[in-house]
A protein has these predicted regions:
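Conserved anion-binding
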Residues: 12-16, 51-54, 93, 99, ...
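Short beta-strand/loop segments at the ligand-binding rim of alpha/beta enzyme cores
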Residues: 5-6, 77-86, 102-103
Length: 171
């Protein structure tokens, strides 16, 4: 049995480094979703806030207004598609999980919003923990004499924190 999954990305931002706002218009976003599914994607990651170096915060209500209609559209055409939400905001995560997302992709590793792990646990969802410490959010910089040690320590702490909320680290 092949466990390989094709993951599609849908950036709903004007300042995305990968697609420069191509999917701000909902009809373009829907066409892109249809195309990703036709090409075999079984997992779609949706984000409404860029996290490229020097990004600006997008308020929660704007993120929700962009993402919820997309989740509803995906679920209306294919219930089997796994949906992850790329957000650092627990309020966005909470509403998106209520509407059918099952995974939160938090580039900050849950360090931006102290309620994130609680929300993920409440929904028995999965979380992708990224590395974007606060000191790196405004510039693309990481200084370490031993990068592997630094990252291992960072992720060990995040995983331990997630486990204290009952989040299964084997998912």
């Amino acid at each position: 049995r092949n466990k390989t999954k094709l993951i599609g990305i849908l950036n709903l931002t004007t300042d995305s480094f990968s697609d420069a706002g191509s999917y701000i218009d909902i009809s373009n976003a829907k066409k892109h979703i249809d195309q990703m599914i036709e090409q075999g994607c079984t997992f779609i990651d949706i984000g409404a806030e860029s996290t490229k170096p020097g990004f600006r915060d997008i308020d929660v209500s704007t993120q929700i207004k962009k993402i919820i209609p997309i989740i509803k559209y995906i679920k209306s055409i294919n219930q089997e598609i796994s949906i992850s939400i790329d957000t650092r905001a627990s309020e966005v995560a909470d509403l998106c999980l209520e509407h059918g997302a099952s995974i939160i992709n938090d580039v900050s590793g849950s360090t931006h919003d102290e309620q994130m792990l609680s929300v993920v646990s409440k929904h028995n969802a999965e979380i992708i923990l990224g590395h974007l410490p606060k000191e790196h959010q405004k510039k693309d910089l990481m200084i370490s004499s031993d990068i592997l040690f630094t990252l291992t320590k960072y992720f060990d702490q995040l995983i331990s924190a997630a486990e204290t909320y009952g989040i299964d680290n084997t998912k």
